[in-house]
């Protein structure tokens, strides 16, 4: 099996509260989220847009269920969605991915920059749902770093 997605829905309130506390105590920051965590990242960005410089959503499995007008706080936050292999043959992903593409289009319509990377379409193959654990994870991290740099968000480390 190349795609699996565990679901923990009983801790949604605690997770949302933790994201809110993160926004209150720290920031600004770039949110890098995966799967179920992407919904929390977007929800937190809606509540605290001044704290979020960008969102990187790796194989997102959900998004905030809000109207188009409520998406306005996200218009100044660049966003990247990253998709790996083996999605088309999985019943859940064949339903989720079109919904996420529609969500990305709604974000664009409100003025947000949303880049959508289909890794196989970019010539990158062999990824599971856990892209950060795959053999090419370092290459993917470098690609994301370049995307962040293109947004003006990378800070060069101090020379020792």
Roles of regions detected by a PLM:
Residues 1-10:
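Cap/lid segment of the alpha/beta-hydrolase catalytic domain
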Residues 9-30:
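Conserved acidic catalytic loop of the alpha/beta-hydrolase fold
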Residues 24-25, 33, 72-75:
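Extracellular/periplasmic catalytic domains that process cell-envelope and extracellular macromolecules
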Residues 31-32, 55:
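Conserved alpha/beta-hydrolase fold motif
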Residues 32-41, 45:
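Gly/Ala-rich beta-loop-alpha elbow adjacent to hydrolase catalytic centers
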Residues 57-119:
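The feature captures the conserved acid-bearing segment of alpha/beta-hydrolase catalytic domains
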Residues 124-126, 130-160:
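Catalytic active-site module of serine/aspartate enzymes centered on a nucleophile-bearing elbow/loop
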């Amino acid at each position: 099996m190349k795609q699996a997605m565990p679901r923990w829905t009983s801790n949604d309130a605690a997770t949302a509260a933790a994201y809110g506390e993160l926004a209150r105590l720290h920031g600004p920051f770039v949110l890098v989220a995966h799967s179920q965590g992407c919904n929390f990242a977007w929800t937190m960005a809606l509540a605290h847009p001044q704290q979020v410089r960008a969102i990187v959503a790796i194989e997102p499995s959900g998004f905030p269920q809000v109207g188009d007008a409520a998406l306005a706080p996200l218009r100044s936050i660049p966003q990247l969605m990253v998709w790996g292999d083996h999605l088309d043959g999985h019943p859940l992903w064949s339903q989720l991915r079109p919904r996420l593409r529609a969500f990305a289009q709604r974000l664009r319509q409100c003025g947000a920059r949303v880049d959508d990377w289909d890794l196989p379409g970019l010539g990158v193959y062999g990824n599971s749902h856990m892209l950060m654990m795959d053999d090419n994870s370092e290459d993917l991290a470098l690609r994301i770093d370049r995307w962040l740099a293109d947004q003006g968000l990378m800070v060069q480390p101090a020379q020792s």
